[in-house]
Structures are given as C-alpha cells and as structure tokens.
C-alpha cells in the first residue's frame, strides 16, 4: 500500500508565497549581517571542542549578542515549539560561564535582526504547520502480523451456462389465408329505346345481378361447360324471370374472357347488349342475360369467420365451414338452404374442357347477387397463426440472471426470454411450428453438424421479447461429449446432469381460457440494439477482466518485494500496509508492531547541527529533535526519522563527509542541511513530484436489456387514414342484408312448399310413384300456373278494368239477344225477314191508297184483301221445313267432327225428312183458280 502523505501546513497556498517572501528577506538580512560581521572561523571546521550540547536552546531576546566559540548562531527553525528556560542546560565554556561576550552597538543591531527573523518563522510555523509527528516506541512482540499469501485471480463472469445450437425464429403470421374461389352470376341488362324517324335513342338502362342456381352450376357449367340464357331470381319480394334477347331460354357455351390477370380468369356467354329497333315514334324494351364465371383469389384473416373476394365482396362464412364434425363449428351466417357441400366434385377447366382426375369437396354458397364456390379443406393443417421468419445455423444461448439470451452473429441480433420454456400448444393454430422447426433443424444438422456435434435432448421453445417464438435445438461437440462420458464413467455425473437438464416447461393454469396468439412487433431494431450492447459489453468486460487479472498478478508479484522490503525497513512497510503509523521490527518471519503516538507540531524543536560533539569524524545521519508529548510535559530528546517519525534513540550516525547536502521531511515541508548544518526550509510545492502511483479505476458495464417500444400501434396506423376500405365495403354490402329479409323472400311461395311436399310424397312410393308424381305434378303445375295467371291478371288494375268492360259488353249483348228472341216469338216472319216484311207492307199500303181513290172513302174497308188460310198454312209448313233443314245441316256439320255415330244420326234424320212427303215449292205469284177473291 502507498505510504501516507504528511499533512500540509494549515492555510491556503498564498501562505507559501509569504514564506518565500520572508525567506528572501531573511536571506538578504543574513547577507547584510555577514558583510558587517568581523572575520572569523565559520562552519563545522571552526567548532569549539568545549561545546557539549549542539541542541538549540530557547533564549531570551537579546541573548544572542555574540557568536559562540565555533562561529555558530543558535536559531529556532520551523517546527520548533515554545521556548523553555532549559534548567538542565550544561554550562558553556570553562568555569561555568555562559561563554558569551557583551558586544558593541553593532552586535545589538544583529541581535534585533535575529529576533525579527525568529518571530517571522514562529508566526509562519504557527499559521501553516499542520503535519503531525509520531513517536513510535520499540515493538515488544506483543502484537505480531504476517503478510497475506498470494490470492487467486478470479475471472470476470460474462455469463454462465453457454449453450450452442440451431434455432428457428417464428413470428406472428399477419398474412391472410389465401385460396381460389369461383364466382357464378348472371348479369341482367334491360334497355329501353325510342325510334325516331331517322335515329335510335337509348332512353333507359337497368342492370342487375342474379345468382346461378346450384343445379345449373353442377349440371351445366361444370358438367358441359355451358350456361342457360335465362334466369329466375327474386327482387322486391317477387319472382322475376329474364330471357336473353327476349327469346326462350337455351343453353349457351361459355367463352374465355378477353383479358385476364395472373390470379384470375373469367368466362361469359355474350358480350353484346340487346337493344331492339322499334317502330318510328314508339318505345321498345330489350333484355340481355350474360352468364359470367370468374375464378379469383379469396382471402380470410384470423379468426377466419369470413372471407373477401378479389372483387371486394364479403362472404360472411368461414372458408372451412362444412358438414364434418370440426367444420360444423365454423361460423356461417347464411340460411342452411343457401349452402351446399358437394362430395366427389370433379372441377372442369373451362378453357380446355378437361375435367380433373381427382375429386374434391366443393362448397357452394349463394348470396343475393352471386353464387361462390371453393374447394373445402380442413382448417387444422392449412392455417397457422405463426410463420417461420429466420433459420439460424449458429445460435448461442447464455444465462444472465433470470433470463436467457439468444445471440446470433449472422442476424446481429439478441433475443431475450425467461428461463421457462413456452410450448407452442399454448398458441392457437400453431400446428405448423413443430413440423417446420423439425424439418429445418434436421436439414441443417444433417448438412453441417452431423460429423462434429451431437444433439442434447429435443427441441426447446421459448417466447422472446417482442413476440418471437424460438425453437432451439441444443448441440454438444463430440470432444465435449466424450469428456462428459468419461466424467459419467468416473461417477461424477451430477454436475453434468444439472448442466444438460432442459429448462422447465410452462403449463397453462387450471381453468385457463382459450388459447391465444402472439403479437410480434413490426421492427426488430431492439434485438439489434441488444446484440450491439451485448457485443460491446462482452468486449469491454473481457478487456477489463484481463486488466483486473493482470493487476491481481502484479499484486501477487509485488508481494515478494514487500516481503523483502520489510526486512530493510519494517516500520515503513508495516505503516504502508496497515494504513496507519506504526512501529515495527522483524521477529523471525513475522513483524512485531507497536502503535505510534502522535505529537503536535508545536511541541517539536529541531537542532541546527548534525555533528556529534567530541567526534569530528562521526555525524548524525538524521537531525536531532526535542519534543514534548503534551504542551506542559517534559522535554524529550530524540532523532528525526522518516516521514515525520521521531525515534527515541539517537544512534543513527554516519561518517562525516565533505559536501554534505540533505533534505529531510519536517512537518509539512522539507528542511535543508548543508555540511551537517541547517540552511533553510523548502516547501513541498518547490520540489517536483514524481508519482509512483498507478491509478486503476475500473467499472464494469452493467447488464441492460432492450425492450421493444412501438411509437405507433397497428390500430393507430390503421386509423391514420381518412378512409378504411375494408370497413366501407363491409358497411355498403351489409346495407341490403341489414334492412331486407333475403331468406324469407326467396322462400315465400306457398305453391313451392305444396309442390315440394307432393314431390316428397310421390318419391316415397318408388319408381312408379315417381312417374305418377311427375304426371300429377305437371298437371298441378299447369293448373297452378293458369290460376296464378288469372289471379295475377285480375290483381292488375288494367286487367280489372278490362274484365269490367267485358262484363258490361256481355250484358249489353244479352239484352239485345233477349230482345231479338222476344220479337221472334211475337212475329217470326218480321224477325226473320224484316226486309221482306217491310216490302209487303209497303205494297199493301200502296194498294190501299189506290183503291181509296177509285171507290171513295166509304169503300175503304171493302178494299182490304181477305187473308187466305191456305197460304197461311203453306207459310207455316215452309217455316217448319226451313227449321228442319237448318237442324239437319247442323247435325251433319257436327257429325263430321264427332265421328261415326253422329253421321248415322244425320242419315236417319234425312230419311225421316224424305218420308214426310213432297218437297218445298215456292208459292206462285198469281192466285189459283177457284180461290176466293
């Protein structure tokens, strides 16, 4: 240990300037005194042999008015204490005289100068001297000490339980599940045109979409590569049928679309809109039905309860829904009759017309505007909530306190986790982790480590900070494994088992909820910072560790020097080692020590000469001092030792030499002796310092772990935009589903329920029942169609008006028919022959008019022709004959339509008429002879 420095003089550094000024003034004064002094012997050579004591005695002012016998002037030097009368002072000179002469006035001047110098030195010593002196009594052996043996130099612990291995780093899978979906729909376009005299104007255009029925998809589109040109769908709670080109439905071939993308294809039936020409000045409406099939990419994100097509339509059903035990638990928000799963479905390539050789399970789901189909796959092996991020061939795992650190130089990253394993079973949809980790680790081990390392246990899983899942396979080199094997054979396998034992595995708490998913940060900069810090920490700590080890080795080597130095100066070595001032001496291989007593600097007086009275060839090696333990104690003689130590013996002597110069530590500075006589005091600041200390202040870097810190979360980034496309599309498409009952609209026909019930009834009767059922259902559907048509016609306001007009017209016709029948009954001839009857009446009126003129008015009654009964009877026979002829003609006409029996009946009627007599003959215009006038 370093030697303790003596205490500095009291006061600040400006005091040393004052000391220097006083010293300069004293030097000038002494030079003046030297010039004025009488010549005489000076220095040690002129020392009087009669001087018995060379110590500085305290004198009163005015005592030094002359020189002593040797030319020396006793002087109090810095560090001297209060003066005492000195009753034990031996007499100077023979006869016990004082040996002093009374001087002249010049001597008085010199005495005054000396007194002034003494006062200045005392004032400086009282103000600035602060270093204590110590008196170390000789050790008696009651207390002995020994030096410590060399210490073992420990290494700096940079970590423990380092393990190398292979690692696979997994991250959160934010990519959606992607699959191929086929969209089936028919696009209806209704156009209205107005034909002018020379131009055609489009006055209206209506577009709509309708889903393709399941049967048409399976039988026509996938079966034949064709599609029907008509479609029946529901709009405004009514069943609507649209025909392409306003013609009856037919099967049309699907042709590839003109353009396609790498992830989508399309087929259609027509690319023209039907807009018929109308007559000039009239409107005409035309309908176009285009059957479209689109194959595109669909995506579904966790928790996979819906998916979205590439066109932006949302389908609110899980892509993994189906009829199996696990698939039934998947979410499907549509009615059961709108979903169908087809087993043994052979997809057809509509471009080449080839069918797939392997069947698949096909899901079909109809929505209000389209039908979507996709290949069903089980959920468990096809989706994974985590995905492989990095495969690290060299990963080092180190244990730091309560954490593991996985460091990869290839990635320049360090991942931190706790000491407990995190099995992937705690993560939902994580079946891919074990499979992919095993495949990657097996490939790396077979390619790189198969000949040099062995595996230690199985794959271990840890959840690192930042949401990274690490699959770690510990490895052990073959040489180290062989050493462990030998240790095991020697029965020292306890530490080996503890070192190779895998960490504990975390288990879910009892009654824990469903499994969750990990959330991985968007950046890995924190892991890179951790790697950088660990790299710097390792480098710095290794460097400081080497320095500390070298320092320890240096201390052990210096211990040998200490052991040798204690034999030369045991007191100094013991004081430097113990850290306090002690006295010491060697007792064999140990040191006996004694405690040093501190002495105030004010109680120490130094003598100005180092010569031994009576022996001119021998001098003291160190100055002599007088001291008191207390301020009022007796004066004790001693010798100044090293570093302000006062020795009670005065036996440190040496042969006197010429040109003697020495500096001795006295108080807070140095005293300078030249030719074994005091010269002056030197400040410590005036002596350049050569330091032997080597400062070593080492501070190890503390362990620090960087944690991920997100400035903006995913939700904040998502909400930073003005529009959320997914939310806008979702709201727009939910509008129709939210305010309309689509399912009830599609199933509101009571006739359809009746027909479905009849069909199920006849299906249960076997093949014959099915045949009868088809006939009955056909007739029933016809009747229902007629009744539905009549009811629909009557429910139409224009239809009701037309029916009313027809009824009114029927009533008017019945009225006129009834009137005609009444007239026929009253006057058949007039009813049957109105023109003939009118002519006969006109002739009768003319005959009556001419007869009256000839015969006079009185002969008017006689002029009327008498009615002939025979003619009347003949007229009646004529009417009856005409009736029979009319009946015969009707019978013959009906016989031609009805068949043989009717013809026989007509023939019999002819026979009856022929048997009745003569045929009809018209009446002669003249009267027969013999008739009455």
From Swiss-Prot:
Biased composition (Acidic residues): 54-69
Signal peptide: 1-36
Record field: compositional bias (Low complexity): 36-49
UniProt short sequence motif Golgi targeting, positions renumbered to this chain: 881-884
Region (Disordered): 36-115
Entries under SUPFAM superfamilies matching the protein: Viral glycoprotein ectodomain-like
Keyword Nucleotide-binding among record annotations: no
Virion surface side: 37-797
Any Pfam family matching the protein: Glycoprotein_B
Region feature (Involved in fusion and/or binding to host membrane): 193-199, 278-285
Domain of life: Viruses
GO biological process, one term: symbiont entry into host cell
The keyword Glycoprotein is annotated on this UniProt entry: yes
Motif (Internalization motif): 920-923
Span list, region Hydrophobic membrane proximal region: 742-795, 754-795
Subcellular location: Virion membrane; Host cell membrane; Host endosome membrane; Host Golgi apparatus membrane
Keywords: Disulfide bond, Glycoprotein, Host cell membrane, Host endosome, Host Golgi apparatus, Host membrane, Host-virus interaction, Membrane, Signal, Transmembrane, Transmembrane helix, Viral attachment to host cell, Viral envelope protein, Virion, Virus entry into host cell
Segments on the Intravirion side according to the record's topology features: 819-933
Disulfide bonds: 136-596, 153-552, 227-291, 384-432, 619-656
Family according to the record: Belongs to the herpesviridae glycoprotein B family.
Quaternary context: Homotrimer; disulfide-linked. Binds to heparan sulfate proteoglycans. Interacts with gH/gL heterodimer.
UniProt-recorded name of the protein: Envelope glycoprotein B
Organism, as annotated: Herpesvirus ateles type 1 (strain Lennette)
Lineage: Viruses, Duplodnaviria, Heunggongvirae, Peploviricota, Herviviricetes
Gene: gB
């Amino acid at each position: 240990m370093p030697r303790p420095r003596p205490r500095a003089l009291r006061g600040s550094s400006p005091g040393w300037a004052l000391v220097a000024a006083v010293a300069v003034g004293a030097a000038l004064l002494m030079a003046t005194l030297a010039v004025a002094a009488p010549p005489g012997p000076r220095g040690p050579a002129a020392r009087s042999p009669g001087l018995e004591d060379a110590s500085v005695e305290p004198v009163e002012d005015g005592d030094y008015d002359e020189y002593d016998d040797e030319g020396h002037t006793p002087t109090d030097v810095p560090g001297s204490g209060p003066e005492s009368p000195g009753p034990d002072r031996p007499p100077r000179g023979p006869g016990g005289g004082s040996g002093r002469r009374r001087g002249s006035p010049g001597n008085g001047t010199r005495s005054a100068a000396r007194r002034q110098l003494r006062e200045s030195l005392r004032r400086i010593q009282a103000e600035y001297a602060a270093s204590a002196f110590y008196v170390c009594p000789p050790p008696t052996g009651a207390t002995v000490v020994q030096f410590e043996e060399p210490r073992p130099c420990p290494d700096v612990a940079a970590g423990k339980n380092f393990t190398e291995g292979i690692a696979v780093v997994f991250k959160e899978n934010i990519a959606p599940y992607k699959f191929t979906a086929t969209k089936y729909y028919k696009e209806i376009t209704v156009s209205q045109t107005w034909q002018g005299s020379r131009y055609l104007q489009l006055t209206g255009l209506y577009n709509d979409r309708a889903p393709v029925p399941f049967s048409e998809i399976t039988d026509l589109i996938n079966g034949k590569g064709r599609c029907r040109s008509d479609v029946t769908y529901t709009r405004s709670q009514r069943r609507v049928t649209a025909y392409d080109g306003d013609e009856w439905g037919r099967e049309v071939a699907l042709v590839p679309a003109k353009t396609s993308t790498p992830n989508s294809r399309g087929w259609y039936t027509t690319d023209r809109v039907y807009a018929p020409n109308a007559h000039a000045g009239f409107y005409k409406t035309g309908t176009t039905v285009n059957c479209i099939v689109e194959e595109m990419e669909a995506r579904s994100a966790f928790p996979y309860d819906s998916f979205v097509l590439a066109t932006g339509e949302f389908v609110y059903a899980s892509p993994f829904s189906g009829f199996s035990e696990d698939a039934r638990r998947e979410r499907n928000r549509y009615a059961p009759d709108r979903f169908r799963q087809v087993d043994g479905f052979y997809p057809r390539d509509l471009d080449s017309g080839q069918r797939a050789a392997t069947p698949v399970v096909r899901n079909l789901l109809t929505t209000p505007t389209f039908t979507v189909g996709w290949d069903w796959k089980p959920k468990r092996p096809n989706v994974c909530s985590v995905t492989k991020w990095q495969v690290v061939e060299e990963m080092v795992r180190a244990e730091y306190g309560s954490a593991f650190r996985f460091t990869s130089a290839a990635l320049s990253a360090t991942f931190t986790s706790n000491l407990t394993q995190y099995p992937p079973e705690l993560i939902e949809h994580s079946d891919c982790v074990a499979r992919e980790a095993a495949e990657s680790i097996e490939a790396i081990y077979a390619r790189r480590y198969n000949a040099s390392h062995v595996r230690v246990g199985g794959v271990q899983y840890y959840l690192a900070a930042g949401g990274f899942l690490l699959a770690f396979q510990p490895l052990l080199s073959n040489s180290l494994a062989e050493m462990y094997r030998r240790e095991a054979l020697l029965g020292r396998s306890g530490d080996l088992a503890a070192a190779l034992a895998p960490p504990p595995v975390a288990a879910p708490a009892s009654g824990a909820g469903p499994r969750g998913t990990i959330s991985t940060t968007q950046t890995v900069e924190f892991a890179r910072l951790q790697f950088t810090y660990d790299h710097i920490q390792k480098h710095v700590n290794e460097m400081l560790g080497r320095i500390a080890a070298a320092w320890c080795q240096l201390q052990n080597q210096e211990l040998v020097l200490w052991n040798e130095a204690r034999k030369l100066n045991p007191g100094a070595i013991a004081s430097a080692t113990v850290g306090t001032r002690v006295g010491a001496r060697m007792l064999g291989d140990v040191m006996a020590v004694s405690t040093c007593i501190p002495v105030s600097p004010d109680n120490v007086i130094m003598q100005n000469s180092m010569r031994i009275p009576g022996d001119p060839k021998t001098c003291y090696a160190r100055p002599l001092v007088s001291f008191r333990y207390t301020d009022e104690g007796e004066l004790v003689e001693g010798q100044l030792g090293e570093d302000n130590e006062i020795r009670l013996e005065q036996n440190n002597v040496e042969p006197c030499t010429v040109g003697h110069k020495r500096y001795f530590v006295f108080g807070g500075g140095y005293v300078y002796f030249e030719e074994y006589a005091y010269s002056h005091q030197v400040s410590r600041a005036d002596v350049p310092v050569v330091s032997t200390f080597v400062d070593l202040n080492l501070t190890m870097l503390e362990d620090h772990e960087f944690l991920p810190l997100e400035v903006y979360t995913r939700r904040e980034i998502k909400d930073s935009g003005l529009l959320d496309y997914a939310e806008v599309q979702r709201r727009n498409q939910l509008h129709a589903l939210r305010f309309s009952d689509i399912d009830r609209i599609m199933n509101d026909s009571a006739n359809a329920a009746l027909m479905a019930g009849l069909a199920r009834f006849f299906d249960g009767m076997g093949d014959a029942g099915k045949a009868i059922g088809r006939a009955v259902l056909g007739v029933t559907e016809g009747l229902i169609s007629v009744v539905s048509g009549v009811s629909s016609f009557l429910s139409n306001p224009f239809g009701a008006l037309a029916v009313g007009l027809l009824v009114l017209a029927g009533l008017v016709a019945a009225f006129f028919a009834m009137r005609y029948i009444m007239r026929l009954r009253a006057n058949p001839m007039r009813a049957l022959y109105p023109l003939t009857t009118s002519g006969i009446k006109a002739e009768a009126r003319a005959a009556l008019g001419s007869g009256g003129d000839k015969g006079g008015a009185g002969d008017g009654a006689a002029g009327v022709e008498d009615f002939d009964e025979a003619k009347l009877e003949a007229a009646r026979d004529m009417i009856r004959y005409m009736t029979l002829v009319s009946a015969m003609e009707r019978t013959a006409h009906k016989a031609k339509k009805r068949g043989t029996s009717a013809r026989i009946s007509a023939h019999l009627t002819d026979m009856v008429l022929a048997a009745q007599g003569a045929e009809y003959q018209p009446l002669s215009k003249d009267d027969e002879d013999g008739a009455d006038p």
